[in-house]
Amino acid sequence: MKKVEAIIRPEKLEIVKKALSDAGYVGMTVSEVKGRGVQGGIVERYRGREYIVDLIPKVKIELVVKEEDVDNVIDIICENARTGNPGDGKIFVIPVERVVRVRTKEEGKEAL
């Protein structure tokens, strides 16, 4: 099993979530996060003054999936989150040693 963590633009959350759900990946955790990549921050103007915003609001989607589903999940996220501009996000794939459903103590793929 693998954990897929995707950091994406907040405005892309609903379309990515729907695309994942439509493909059968309904179990996910979503968190509001802030961060920055190579591009650094952004400069915003407010009442004639410039402000540097160095941590940009993003959304993190986390899913644990079977190893054979990882490439499909990555494709779905990329197809629906991409704008072609810096700041579209990153996807991380992390090994998961064990999954246990708290309610029933089922383990492995059955716990997903």
UniProtKB/Swiss-Prot annotation:
ATP binds at T29, V38, V64, P86, G87, D88, G89, K90, R101, V102, R103. It comes from the Archaea. InterPro entries: N-reg_PII (IPR002187), N-reg_PII-like_a/b (IPR011322), N-reg_PII/ATP_PRibTrfase_C (IPR015867), N-reg_PII_CS (IPR017918). It holds the Pfam family P-II. 2-oxoglutarate binds at I52, V53, D54. SMART domains: P-II (SM00938). It is found in: Cytoplasm. PANTHER family: NITROGEN REGULATORY PROTEIN P-II, NITROGEN REGULATORY PROTEIN P-II HOMOLOG. Homotrimer. Interacts and forms a complex with Amt1. Belongs to the P(II) protein family. This is Nitrogen regulatory protein GlnK1. It comes from Methanocaldococcus jannaschii (strain ATCC 43067 / DSM 2661 / JAL-1 / JCM 10045 / NBRC 100440).
